[in-house]
Amino acid sequence: MTTSAAASVAEFSDHATTETLATLLHDWAARLGDEIAVTFLDYRTSDDGRAGFLTWRELDDRVSAVAARAAELAAPGERAAVLVEQSADYVVAFLGAIRAGLVAVPLFAPNLPGHAGRLTAVLADCDPRLALTTAPQLDQVREFVDPKRTELVAVDLVPPAREREWPVPEPDDLAYLQYTSGSTRSPAGVMLSHRNVLANARQACAAYGAVTGRTTTVSWLPLFHDMGLVLGIAAPMAAGIGTTLLDPVAFLESPGRWLRALSASPGAISAAPNFAYGYSASRVSEREKSYLELSRVVSLINGSEPVLPSTIAQFQAAFGGCGLDPAVHRASYGLAEATVLVSVTDAGEPSRQVAFDRDRLAAGAAVPAGSGASSTLVSCGHAAGQQLRIVDPEKRQAVPDGKVGEIWVRGENVGRGYWRNPTTSAETFGLRLDGTDGWLATGDLGVLFDGELYVTGRRKDLVIVDGRNHYPQDIEQTVEAHPAVRRHSAAAFAIPLDEGEGAVVVLERAKNLADGEANLTAAAEGLRAEVAARHGLKLTDLVFLAPGEVPRTSSGKISRSACRARYLDGAFADRRLS
């Protein structure tokens, strides 16, 4: 990082005991005034993306107005759910809650398809005193909250506020709850303090080269997503840089919109899951490319799901002719429990790719491949201002470089635990290693090779498709509720695909399901539709087995790992219905 970048990020860091994202906003508003802080490209009302702007001063004034109203209705430390569509109003609502001393809960508008179950579960878990939304969403929000327990505020209707004093939190007071599970039954809210988010925002700014007056962030990631929130709100507040936001749907409808926003934003820093880079490369036309100027892009972060070498190459081949420098690709690793960012590749250098011996890697050793089968992994670089170790999770001891183990992290960015879940918190946070406390067990597997982190898999059984996390037990419960499926027989897992990861379910048919391909095909169609409706997930494959054929452990539990291994070995090839 350059000296000027470091100075820019650190300039407003002298009073760490009272800093929040909202106090930083006030400082930048005093300094930057009428410069643009937030740009939202609205493709809901205009095919061309009507641009709306908030200056630093306007943003600060609107945040104060929302905070003043929020403070009338809720006490410091109570929760404020943010139920706003992707927009500048979302930024206002989130920062308004923080300025009022409330614990923000970044969520989404109730009209987001396929998420009603999750919204209901999260609202029940966080028990908000306040729901921040916009006027068009008020009626829908009322269907999800108890008016006796939760007050509603339309942030776009709040009048200006008079000057007043705001609560001064301690650094370790909660700033927000980052919900991670996507489950409709067991949501997990990571407790993140002001210290946590400011530490990680500054770690990100330092790693990505954010410089006041010279860089901007560009993001279509959901603002309720950990990466979207830090990139779209926290990092800009830390460094005093503008942000340009798009709705995720706008990107999915036409990925060229993201590329045009990058082209129009000098010094652009952006991030996306691996799938988005391949999606963009295959969907942006040559005509669209002719209008792009990408030579001023500073960093393109690739994270949130496994980074594939083929995708990086595909994206660079597609847009290299538009001036895109291959050195801007930054493979990254992170998780919500560490706010978001843990490690990233060095600036100005293409990400390292190493072909490891596949069998040795599966056995726990990272050895460059010879003539045998190989697995090529992309380096996720070095820890970003925090400590990182590879650990034997059973012995809780660090392992040597070149050995696969669980990734453990320690730093000021690591959260306090899971909201109202002390048991799981104690298993994950504040662990002891090498004589020091405060370590986070990530549940992910990786290896340090030549000093850089390579993520090899997941100790947890998360299924990650298109950048979204799905817990397999949730998918399994949905599948097992179908009358064609034997109870307690389904195994859901991820498999590698050329464009990322796919989701597979292997299950046992119910004993009363009549034999015949037509019956199985009809059942499979119903199951696919149910999984898509409940989880927003398109299954790559669905396999019906006879009762008793799904692999189980000695205690009778379904063994996802054994099932996945047999699937990848082709043991179920003749049972596929896809």
Language-model features: locations:
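Conserved pre-ATP/AMP-binding loop-to-beta segment of ANL
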Residues: G33-I36, R162-S186, N196, N200, ...
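Conserved AMP-binding/adenylate-forming core of the ANL superfamily
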Residues: V38-A74, E78-V91, L112-T120, V168, ...
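AMP-binding/adenylate-forming catalytic core of the ANL superfamily
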Residues: A131, S263, S270, G411, ...
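Conserved AMP-binding/adenylation subdomain of ANL enzymes
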Residues: N200-T216, D226-A268, R283-R287
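Gly/Ser/Thr-rich phosphate-binding loop
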Residues: G267-A271, R283-A373, Q387-R389, K395-R396
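Conserved ANL (AMP-binding/adenylate-forming) active-site segment centered on the GW(Y/F)…HTG consensus within
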Residues: D359-L377, Q397, V414-G443, E476
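Conserved beta-loop-beta connector loops within the AMP-binding
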Residues: A365-H382, Q387-W408, D450
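Conserved C-terminal "lid"/linker of ANL adenylate-forming enzymes
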Residues: S489-F493, V504-V505, R528-S578
